[in-house]
Amino acid sequence: MNPAHLLILAAVCVSPLGASSNRPMPLNLYQFKNMIQCTVPNRSWWHFADYGCYCGRGGSGTPVDDLDRCCQIHDNCYNEAEKISRCWPYFKTYSYECSQGTLTCKGGNNACAAAVCDCDRLAAICFAGAPYNDNNYNIDLKARCQ
């Protein structure tokens, strides 16, 4: 299977269209969800799963705003992490901690886990600093993300 298709498949696992509380999710995406909840406790993580052109499944075109740009940067960060031997970011778990809204990737992570943890940590911090525009949730990707 094409790696790009694998990434899209993994991203769809968190899509609110088919998500339920008992549906399995790749462990890394579960950790990323928890990081988002650490930095943005007042908004459910699934609000970020289908936002703009880059948050959630795939990504193309010009980001619609700063929050969408956070997701584009996160996608690019995962693409860089994939260059590490045997590193599959959507499935790589890592050690981190959340303390009072502050995320820290722990030192015991291998190169892949450290890279993926940092991608997720930086994205969660970026999400916390970017305004959320309800009009950019669940947009028409074909019309707005060319």
From Swiss-Prot:
SMART domains: PA2c. One of its GO terms (biological process) is positive regulation of fibroblast proliferation. Binds 1 Ca(2+) ion. It comes from Naja sputatrix (Malayan spitting cobra). Residues 1-21 form the signal peptide. This is Neutral phospholipase A2 muscarinic inhibitor. GO terms for molecular function: calcium ion binding; calcium-dependent phospholipase A2 activity; phospholipid binding; signaling receptor binding; toxin activity. Keywords: Calcium, Disulfide bond, G-protein coupled acetylcholine receptor impairing toxin, G-protein coupled receptor impairing toxin, Hydrolase, Lipid degradation, Lipid metabolism, Metal-binding, Secreted, Signal, Toxin. It catalyses: a 1,2-diacyl-sn-glycero-3-phosphocholine + H2O = a 1-acyl-sn-glycero-3-phosphocholine + a fatty acid + H(+). SUPFAM superfamilies: Phospholipase A2, PLA2 (SSF48619).
